[in-house]
Amino acid sequence: MSKVDFNKETGPREVFCGLTSIVWLHRRMPDAFFLVVGSRTCAHLIQSAAGVMIFAEPRFGTAILEEKDLAGLADAHEELDRVVNDLISRRPEIKTLFLVGSCPSEVIKLDLATVAEKLNLRFSGQVRFVNYSGSGIETTFTQGEDGALKALIPLMNSTDDEKLLLVGTIANNVEDRFKKIFNSIGINNVESFPPRQSTELPKIGKNTKVILTQPYLSDTVRDLKHRGCEIIYAPFPLGVEGSTKWVLAAAAAFKIPELKVHEVIAPLANRARQALQKHTEILRGKKLFLLPESQLEISLARFLHNECEMELIEVGTPYLNKDLMEEELNLLPDDTKIVEGQHVEKQLDRVRASCPDLVVCGMGLANPLEAEGISTKWSIEMVFSPIHGIDQAADLAELFSRPLTRNQILTSKTLATY
């Protein structure tokens, strides 16, 4: 393992909660509905993050817990039953309904697992109910997907068929390109989890080889292991380097020669490196500080240092699963400072002291830092954007070069006015 400088911090933190993952999960599975059991704040968060007006009837909603529910003056279970009945009658196309816990529902100990069991009996054969927690007490925003996928694993049937299972939500067009690459090298049975329809869950078993597309799925990996799946450990498919090593790791698990892989991906890699050049010219030598939020930080740091030649000041991450991240850590330069957890005030002090050219952070910190003259990039954009794969390397780099270019233009215009 690379001799990185590991540190751990505890204290006040500034991150989105796991409810935010509903935004990309509901797009991935259009036959599913996500019902948050929470407060008006929860409802505002999801609606704002998704950019969808409520009259557009999106595939998510909030069962509002009022003050009387929180005070124990009303039966929240009865109210939830009523909301679910109304929802199913108005939206008969729903095939899977996720009951999503929040901070308020957990504070009053609302047992959504029992609620889901009862609803499954009542609506058997019509709608399937599962539950998970998106509470900010327990999760950062990407961990909501981990909870949702973990909740689906008990519903997955068993099989002894040999297959490759891509685990983690990615854009449909990215998934199609990955499958095309795997088919070209001789891996023909490739499925994805989560699937494009919630009712089409892949079957799994001892001959299922799992490779992650996202680094924040620790609980999902643990449960897939318990079902007998083999986990393929690899860097994550961000950039040319990460995507190449990711495909090579999958190929090795199926005993496919490296030469065959390179024959297929070499033309893609060459085009991607050429497309990266204009962004590398902007990013080369620039100092980067990554604050913890998404668990993508280590993979992004590897890409931005190794392929875009940025200097890493500090790489923060909410949680660090060393088993899942070992291959990524091995690709980082020695003495890279990695901080697990967060004491936001101390980290902001280090940001100011280090004078970075770019800070990757949450939306709540971005505007204050911009007001201090520090360029920022919202970490949530990495989850909402199709950034995976060799083909997307230049698009990923552009997410970081764009704020630097913008500030350069604004600075030149400001100087021109004097």
From Swiss-Prot:
<dbReference type="Pfam" id="PF00148">
    <property type="entry name" value="Oxidored_nitro"/>
</dbReference>
<dbReference type="InterPro" id="IPR050293">
    <property type="entry name" value="LIPOR_BchN/ChlN"/>
</dbReference>
<comment type="subunit">
    <text>Protochlorophyllide reductase is composed of three subunits; ChlL, ChlN and ChlB. Forms a heterotetramer of two ChlB and two ChlN subunits.</text>
</comment>
<comment type="pathway">
    <text>Porphyrin-containing compound metabolism; chlorophyll biosynthesis (light-independent).</text>
</comment>
<feature type="binding site">
    <location>
        <position position="17"/>
    </location>
    <ligand>
        <name>[4Fe-4S] cluster</name>
    </ligand>
</feature>
<protein>
    <recommendedName>
        <fullName>Light-independent protochlorophyllide reductase subunit N</fullName>
        <ecNumber>1.3.7.7</ecNumber>
    </recommendedName>
</protein>
<keyword id="KW-0547">Nucleotide-binding</keyword>
<dbReference type="GO" id="GO:0016730">
    <property type="term" value="F:oxidoreductase activity, acting on iron-sulfur proteins as donors"/>
</dbReference>
<comment type="function">
    <text>Component of the dark-operative protochlorophyllide reductase (DPOR) that uses Mg-ATP and reduced ferredoxin to reduce ring D of protochlorophyllide (Pchlide) to form chlorophyllide a (Chlide). This reaction is light-independent. The NB-protein (ChlN-ChlB) is the catalytic component of the complex.</text>
</comment>
<dbReference type="InterPro" id="IPR005970">
    <property type="entry name" value="Protochl_reductN"/>
</dbReference>
<keyword id="KW-0067">ATP-binding</keyword>
<keyword id="KW-0408">Iron</keyword>
<keyword id="KW-0004">4Fe-4S</keyword>
<dbReference type="GO" id="GO:0046872">
    <property type="term" value="F:metal ion binding"/>
</dbReference>
<feature type="binding site">
    <location>
        <position position="42"/>
    </location>
    <ligand>
        <name>[4Fe-4S] cluster</name>
    </ligand>
</feature>
<dbReference type="GO" id="GO:0051539">
    <property type="term" value="F:4 iron, 4 sulfur cluster binding"/>
</dbReference>
<dbReference type="GO" id="GO:0019685">
    <property type="term" value="P:photosynthesis, dark reaction"/>
</dbReference>
<dbReference type="GO" id="GO:0036068">
    <property type="term" value="P:light-independent chlorophyll biosynthetic process"/>
</dbReference>
<dbReference type="GO" id="GO:0016636">
    <property type="term" value="F:oxidoreductase activity, acting on the CH-CH group of donors, iron-sulfur protein as acceptor"/>
</dbReference>
<keyword id="KW-0479">Metal-binding</keyword>
<comment type="similarity">
    <text>Belongs to the BchN/ChlN family.</text>
</comment>
<keyword id="KW-0560">Oxidoreductase</keyword>
<keyword id="KW-0411">Iron-sulfur</keyword>
<keyword id="KW-0149">Chlorophyll biosynthesis</keyword>
<dbReference type="InterPro" id="IPR000510">
    <property type="entry name" value="Nase/OxRdtase_comp1"/>
</dbReference>
<feature type="binding site">
    <location>
        <position position="103"/>
    </location>
    <ligand>
        <name>[4Fe-4S] cluster</name>
    </ligand>
</feature>
<dbReference type="GO" id="GO:0005524">
    <property type="term" value="F:ATP binding"/>
</dbReference>
<keyword id="KW-0602">Photosynthesis</keyword>
